[in-house]
């Protein structure tokens, strides 16, 4: 079949670029990290105790930076709060401000109750500016006894249970926005929110796994082979679920065979051939899933198991970023004429270029470093003793 490409004259630019790719990537990591802490605080999975509180700090750091790419994308970022002050309830983006603010408050309260005992002890041992800051964070209340500890644990449980649906909505909200745009067939699929949510969980699990191995190596977190296996198990399960969702989504497009299938198939096998099939599905998803499967199939030593898990986590972080790219940018590569394509080549020093995307991706790590100056990632003496006891009783069964 011979056809001629044609694009409308006013339809030649990519509007949503790297900033809109970076935002769902950061928010996905936030969701995955929070999910790890929820599995311990709400569902009582004891093997995740060494990373339960640290995951809260990771989630909080990425949540604080999640909106920065969006603000950089706006022409007038000073007007961003208008979506909250003067909301339009018929606008899909109008509810984002409320959902984000709600989850930010919930997460901050969870961290406050989870770290209250640590902050009290740190305030007693500190002096100068750090002591003043900790005293303010504690709201000038440093009472600590068995009753207050019980209240703290109960509040962490209640708030985390409330935060789970809030986190799910916030993480899947981007997928909901894309899926609701019926004018774009590459985005308009009912599976889009679930694809964004599950891939976000994968990225959060992968990053926490890498940070846990790094901090455990230098003694900042308690080493636990049981915790490592649980994180890798969750990563394998989430990856398997994501593979199913991606496969079902592609089958949905193929068997629906709508008028837009011609442009979607052309997009996949031309413009996105390398980034989708090779980088995302092949190198990112395929290699990582094979590594994770081999980890639980082969009888590996703890060191080899940890190394393979770290490599798989790196591949999955890359895969999730490529997935964001292929959806956000890939969905804008074809013209509204459905027979023409656009070109997009991001530059390094643009306002929304490669350098700014790298800066916004690395910024949460600086925030995490600053947060850990006041909230220690090391387990308390009570937690460490409990963890050693439980690990000793379960090690033979799990290993």
Question: Language model features by range: what are they?
Answer:
Residues 307-399:
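TerminUS-proximal long segments
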Residues 6, 41-48, 74-77, 113-124, ...:
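Juxtamembrane/interface segments at transmembrane-helix termini
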Residues 26-44, 54-86, 92-142, 159-163, ...:
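Transmembrane-helix bundle segments that line or gate the permeation/cavity pathway
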Residues 2-3, 71-81, 172-183, 248-260, ...:
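Membrane-helix interface motif
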Residues 1-42, 369, 386, 394-399:
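N-terminal signal-anchor module of multipass membrane proteins
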Residues 24-26, 109-306, 312, 319, ...:
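Long, contiguous internal "core" modules enriched in hydrophobic/ aromatic residues
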Residues 19-23, 94-97, 192-196, 258-285, ...:
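Membrane-interface transmembrane-helix boundary segments in multi-pass integral membrane proteins
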């Amino acid at each position: 079949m011979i056809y001629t490409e044609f694009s409308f004259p006013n339809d030649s630019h990519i509007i949503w670029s790297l900033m809109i790719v970076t935002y769902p990537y950061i928010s996905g990591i936030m969701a995955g990290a929070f999910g790890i802490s929820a599995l311990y605080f709400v569902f009582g999975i004891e093997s995740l105790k060494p990373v339960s509180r640290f995951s809260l700090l990771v989630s909080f750091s990425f949540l604080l930076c999640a909106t920065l790419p969006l603000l950089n994308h706006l022409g007038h970022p000073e007007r961003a709060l208008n979506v909250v002050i003067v909301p339009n309830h018929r606008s899909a983006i109008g509810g984002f401000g409320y959902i984000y603010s709600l989850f930010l408050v919930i997460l901050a309260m969870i961290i406050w109750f989870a770290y209250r005992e640590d902050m009290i002890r740190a305030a007693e041992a500190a002096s100068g500016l750090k002591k003043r800051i900790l005293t303010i964070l504690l709201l000038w209340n440093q009472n600590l006894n068995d009753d207050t500890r019980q209240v703290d644990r109960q509040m962490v449980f209640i708030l985390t249970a409330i935060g789970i649906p809030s986190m799910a909505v916030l993480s899947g909200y981007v997928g909901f926005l894309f899926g609701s745009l019926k004018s774009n067939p590459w985005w308009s699929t009912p599976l889009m929110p679930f694809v964004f949510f599950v891939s976000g969980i994968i990225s959060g699990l992968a990053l926490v796994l890498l940070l846990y191995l790094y901090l455990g190596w230098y003694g900042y977190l308690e080493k636990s082979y049981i915790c490592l296996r649980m994180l890798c198990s969750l990563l394998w399960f989430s990856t398997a679920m994501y593979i199913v969702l991606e496969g079902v989504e592609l089958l949905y497009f193929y068997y629906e065979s709508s008028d837009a299938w011609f442009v979607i198939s052309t997009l996949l096998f031309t413009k996105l051939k390398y980034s989708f099939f090779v980088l995302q599905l092949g190198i990112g998803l395929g290699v990582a899933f094979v590594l994770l499967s081999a980890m639980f199939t082969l009888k590996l030593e703890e060191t080899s198991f940890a190394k393979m898990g770290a490599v798989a986590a790196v591949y999955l972080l890359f895969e999730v970023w490529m997935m964001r790219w292929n959806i956000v940018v890939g969905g804008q590569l074809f013209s509204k004429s459905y027979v023409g394509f656009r070109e997009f080549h991001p530059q390094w020093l643009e306002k929304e270029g490669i350098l700014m995307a790298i800066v916004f991706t690395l910024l949460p790590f600086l925030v995490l470093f600053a947060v850990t100056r006041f909230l220690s990632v090391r387990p308390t003496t009570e937690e460490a003793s409990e963890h050693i006891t439980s690990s000793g009783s379960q090690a033979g069964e799990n290993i």
